[in-house]
């Protein structure tokens, strides 16, 4: 089978890249070892985070770091055995999270977020996926006035600097919005601009069907089997040999299975996360996507039930599941909302692919003329899928990307 482009990885990033190339007339083969959207993209909190112009930094407060070191929290957990391996990544993550550097990174990151809703909207229309989208923002609920007031000030800054819309909620207003939520919260914050997704895997599959309607082909195979040819690239798949002029690495946390073999070294880390679905107790309903701000877990009312998602687990990518955060979160969540029984046989786990400077790698590989990268989107893979696909496709076709790619180039890591 011959194609113009092979896209390695069929998560939301890879599918979005494939769609954007196919929309521009390229013949594309999309490859994954599993079905589309069945890895990291399957289990997120279902938010297209238009408010997320400031990437999640590494804590700088010594007291907070000391509390994290106790390893008993919901928002962060670590495997002690993995610390020596991940320490270089964490050190650079901490370095890039220092205030001045973090502010500069946020300025470079913001254009991606600013295009997130617009680009999703185009694909949602073409994929006829409107039934999966809720255009009602999401909420943060606060246990303390200190955290509430700090986040209110942060929201005011985002409104001033970026036009991000928000609504401050009193205790009573939060109770009116979520009548079955605990009355222990002192208030809330509603981010009005983001969209929510009732079934993140369903949205990836809707984009996948759009890709196939544009003439694209999906095949299963091992991305590590990629090799160069005089005219480009080839890979053996379960459906036979595929050859193409160009290849895109969109493998998320598994990008190194290809990049390392081709001579590129990226200091990447993963933030593993877990979810479980629950039925609400009879006669109750959760109306909004909601985070328990001081505890760091998320409740999302999805098609499959109320999805509880955890914060970050710092561990080896391939280590066995250790859903201690999920069980901690469930115990706390049951005190603030009447969750019913578990709806999943076991916890789901995924791995967010993270760079130390919190920005994805998007663009051309430095030492291969027809190799392209699109990975490292951390918490915002779902949010940034379509805009990543667009700017990469524009660059591959020799067009001027709507957002300059320089801030996201691989060269910043000297790989």
Where are these regions (language model features)?
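Rossmann-like flavin
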Residues: 87-209
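Glycine-rich FAD pyrophosphate-binding loop
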Residues: 23-43
